[in-house]
């Protein structure tokens, strides 16, 4: 296996909170998959949840080397957790097509958060 891409992002949680306060659900609806949206609505700390998801999706867009454009959207990168809570990515629509085009075999996700920040790294392997 070879590393095809690596992306990291850090988000100041208060910035996400300010956007949510200003625009309501718009940001969450734009970046979350339908499944993530359900978790967001029920989460005890929805802004923190949203900030962490945003960081992962930004890191994924960087790892793919594309950013969010040319048919890619944040909600095409879905963060899912295994039984132990380990995060991974499920790809949809153009993101899934791009993964096939690039020969992606594995996606690795790590994420961390503290009081003020959420940080994520995504590694893509062939």
UniProtKB/Swiss-Prot annotation:
<feature type="binding site">
    <location>
        <position position="58"/>
    </location>
    <ligand>
        <name>Mg(2+)</name>
    </ligand>
</feature>
<dbReference type="InterPro" id="IPR037143">
    <property type="entry name" value="4-PPantetheinyl_Trfase_dom_sf"/>
</dbReference>
<comment type="function">
    <text>Transfers the 4'-phosphopantetheine moiety from coenzyme A to a Ser of acyl-carrier-protein.</text>
</comment>
<dbReference type="GO" id="GO:0000287">
    <property type="term" value="F:magnesium ion binding"/>
</dbReference>
<keyword id="KW-0443">Lipid metabolism</keyword>
<dbReference type="GO" id="GO:0006633">
    <property type="term" value="P:fatty acid biosynthetic process"/>
</dbReference>
<keyword id="KW-0444">Lipid biosynthesis</keyword>
<keyword id="KW-0460">Magnesium</keyword>
<comment type="similarity">
    <text>Belongs to the P-Pant transferase superfamily. AcpS family.</text>
</comment>
<keyword id="KW-0808">Transferase</keyword>
<dbReference type="InterPro" id="IPR004568">
    <property type="entry name" value="Ppantetheine-prot_Trfase_dom"/>
</dbReference>
<dbReference type="InterPro" id="IPR002582">
    <property type="entry name" value="ACPS"/>
</dbReference>
<dbReference type="InterPro" id="IPR008278">
    <property type="entry name" value="4-PPantetheinyl_Trfase_dom"/>
</dbReference>
<dbReference type="GO" id="GO:0005737">
    <property type="term" value="C:cytoplasm"/>
</dbReference>
<protein>
    <recommendedName>
        <fullName>Holo-[acyl-carrier-protein] synthase</fullName>
        <ecNumber>2.7.8.7</ecNumber>
    </recommendedName>
</protein>
<keyword id="KW-0963">Cytoplasm</keyword>
<feature type="binding site">
    <location>
        <position position="9"/>
    </location>
    <ligand>
        <name>Mg(2+)</name>
    </ligand>
</feature>
<keyword id="KW-0276">Fatty acid metabolism</keyword>
<keyword id="KW-0275">Fatty acid biosynthesis</keyword>
<dbReference type="Pfam" id="PF01648">
    <property type="entry name" value="ACPS"/>
</dbReference>
<dbReference type="GO" id="GO:0008897">
    <property type="term" value="F:holo-[acyl-carrier-protein] synthase activity"/>
</dbReference>
<keyword id="KW-0479">Metal-binding</keyword>
